[in-house]
Amino acid sequence: MNLALVLGTNVVRKAYRFLFISRKFCNGNFGGNEIDNGFPDLDCGFDEDSNISELRSIDREVISVRSRFLESANHSASRVLVTLQLDESGFNSKSVLDELNVRVSGLLVREVLVGILRNLSYDNKARCAKLAYRFFLWSGEQECFRHTVNSYHLLMKIFAECGEYKAMWRLVDEMVQDGFPTTARTFNLLICSCGEAGLAKQAVVQFMKSKTFNYRPFKHSYNAILNSLLGVKQYKLIEWVYKQMLEDGFSPDVLTYNILLWTNYRLGKMDRFDRLFDEMARDGFSPDSYTYNILLHILGKGNKPLAALTTLNHMKEVGIDPSVLHYTTLIDGLSRAGNLEACKYFLDEMVKAGCRPDVVCYTVMITGYVVSGELDKAKEMFREMTVKGQLPNVFTYNSMIRGLCMAGEFREACWLLKEMESRGCNPNFVVYSTLVSYLRKAGKLSEARKVIREMVKKGHYVHLVPKMMKYRR
């Protein structure tokens, strides 16, 4: 890409004015005496000590009331969840819930629905969807209570997890009939589930025609739809929606162009990518921080460190300081291209520029070293990040455990698993399955079984044990 075509951007720097009002102003005392400041002592009728004590007392009382309310809601939610679990043939959920005599509030509804969502599994999907809807109907019938948009969204999430797509659509209709507008969050929930079911286009068409779609904070409904489609990687559908958008007389903005640029890159349409970039400039839109992030990703994966350096320098010239995100995106791309020397160069340049590498950046570097078989450098980077106060996350640990296993250092890998748990970082299924798979390949079957037993003992991924027994990396 010819970066000479990149237009400069006007940088608007907001000035913030802070106004400090001192209590000293009440009595005219600015550190001098009556003669120094020219004002006599003023009595504002404010006894500071007694009033502060009173305010503190009120604060404690408010906090206490709030704590009691939260405790009461959590306790009531637990009772409701236990009651719903009693569901059997002939079970009258309405009368049983009435007998609980709980105070229905938005918090109670949220806690119950979240509780159902957490307990949802492959075996109880249909039951969970039914119980959630029964509770939703019952709570909506209680006096002095009305469901919120968040309540509808939580129930939609449960329906989505349970594969109840028709129920989701009916709930959207109920939500609109109840006077609530559909939002970008509503559409996002629908598109995530409908995309998996092959109904994404149907959802898009309905929202494009909807008169109750509250698309804020986006410029128009099309941007809200395009943004959600990008999140679920519906690239072909993005192209179709963009054509509909132009036919309806809507103009693209920087966000629209960024979505289209990324879409065409993912579809491998680089000629179209270049044309869009030029079109963006002709329409008077300067590349923003996200546009440059896309460019750096492409240059990184294309193993073009010199062009990337030119882009970073150009960003500074137009007033956009490269952030940790920009450097990490570039380093990730170069790492995937196998250019770890360039990765280290840009990591050092990042530090020189005053950007502190975060856990994601370090994890990208560690993963790159592991993949290339440079375990010693991965270990060194792991030590460096902890010394500099960046706590490893589950992805960091997974990369390190994989690297140790690849090098046959199984004792260290098992020790690292215990370390991450002691630091409050819960291993995910990938961590366990990676370790078990490599132990098996090395013929260390007893050690592999021990890891599985520890996992089950802690209650982690018990339902996935059969999958792990067949797991091969």
Curated annotation (Swiss-Prot):
The PPR repeat ranges on this chain: 148-182, 183-217, 218-252, 253-287, 288-322, 323-357, 358-392, 393-427, 428-462
Tagged with keyword Repeat: yes
UniProt cross-references to Gene3D superfamilies, sorted A to Z: Tetratricopeptide repeat domain
Transmembrane segments: none
Keywords, ordered alphabetically: Repeat
Disulphide-bonded residues: none
NCBIfam families per the UniProt record, alphabetical: PPR (TIGR00756)
PANTHER family according to UniProt: PENTATRICOPEPTIDE REPEAT-CONTAINING PROTEIN 1, MITOCHONDRIAL, PENTATRICOPEPTIDE REPEAT-CONTAINING PROTEIN 2
Family: Belongs to the PPR family. P subfamily.
Name by which UniProt lists this protein: Pentatricopeptide repeat-containing protein At3g60050
Species name: Arabidopsis thaliana (Mouse-ear cress)
